[in-house]
């Protein structure tokens, strides 16, 4: 029996420090009104206490809400309530949508129409353990220096923002994620 191949639509990766972007703006990283760098206190005011919390490495946490037949996962910059949103994922049929209206169940064609791009093959994702297909777009990298509170030093590297739409074998969206990452150089 052939295993179905999980498909990722790696839609847009935005490299930015000072608002430089292309087809997607940082402000477009918004799922059901939750956006990048929003105060976690605002998320708690809207959704209440999380159903469960996973702690991040080395700092931060992921607040998980069970909504309908799916999950809303909100990553925070700190284990404290005063943290800010660093990423959001919706998995399954939550009824939630990206700012553009794309939601779980949308077709890959709809996503491409809104954001552009094409499907490409990538090597296996560690968690999925199989090859993935995705759409990607990126812009020029900008560098910055930031203070790393965990390690206690200034770090030179780059920030980037990413928005991924994961697809099933029928090219329907099954998961949506956005986040910010920082990589040292």
Where does each model-flagged region fall?
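Positively charged n-region of N-terminal signal peptides that target proteins for export
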Residues: 1-4
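Boundary at the C-terminal end of the N-terminal hydrophobic targeting segment
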Residues: 21-25
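A cross-family detector of function-defining hotspots
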Residues: 38-81, 103-185
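Eukaryote-biased recognition of intrinsically disordered, low-complexity regulatory segments
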Residues: 86-89
